[in-house]
Amino acid sequence: MSKKYSVPESIKLKTHLDEASFDSMYLDSINNPESFWATQASKHITWIKEPNHISSIEMEKGEIEWFNDGILNASFNCIDRHLSNPDALAIIWESDDPSKDKKISYGHLHDEVCKFANLLKNRGIKKGDRVCIYMPMIPEATYAMLACARIGAVHSVVFGGFSVESLKDRILDSNCETVITANEGIRGGKRIPLKENVDKAIKSCPNVHSVIVVKRTGEELNLISKVDVDYLIEKEKFEAHCDCEPMKSEDPLFILYTSGSTGKPKGVLHTTGGYLLGAAITPVSYTHLTLP
């Protein structure tokens, strides 16, 4: 028999739901799923077109759809709807070197994402195109994901510690035409040759027409091909405004590969509306902070 432990008072004070409210919400989600999720979608998502159809679930076929007649944009929901308070804190980035940590406001995030999105569009990337993101854990990785979402491109994040072979396999399998990377990554003081790995991987990826490189360290970018782009230089050629592409709720948002522990890694395609709502209601607490 399992034991039940009480939640410490210090934790209770930081949550946005008490135990009774959570239990009530849970029962409502089980007993009235359509109305429950309709309420959550209206409360947490800003829609271009509100959905009338909430869900379609056929478990035997493995076919599940959420809000399939709704229209929205993930980048808008993550950034633009918060711009009434542009100095509010959007990202706290902890660097490998603690002296270089950053706090990024929604206003700054918006500008960087829009410039990145315009750079992608200038490279011919459009709605539905696949973009591989092979980067260290730096703010530009988030800018890249949100820029893809802004223009309707589908991103596939590949862990920066993966080998050349693993990177190549994921680029080919997801049919990516663009790779976003950095000259190097840093983990625990160790340098990881990301750009070098990309150069090796794309020799077997004929569809890749652009490699956008962020300068993470003081080492040279090693731009050796006509497909290579210096992100820090190129992004400043573009304005900090980019309209959001209207996306159907069931349009693809990103691809994430399984671990491969039971066979070849499989690309799991996540769609926009359902994923976004799940991400929105997951945090235990949420507080708007203002940059000092």
List PLM regions with ranges.
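Hydrophobic alpha-helical segments in the ANL/AMP-binding
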Residues: 77-80, 121, 139-159, 166-168, ...
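N-lobe entry segment of adenylate-forming
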Residues: 1-104, 108-111, 115, 197, ...
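Conserved AMP-binding A3 loop
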Residues: 102-107, 245, 253-277
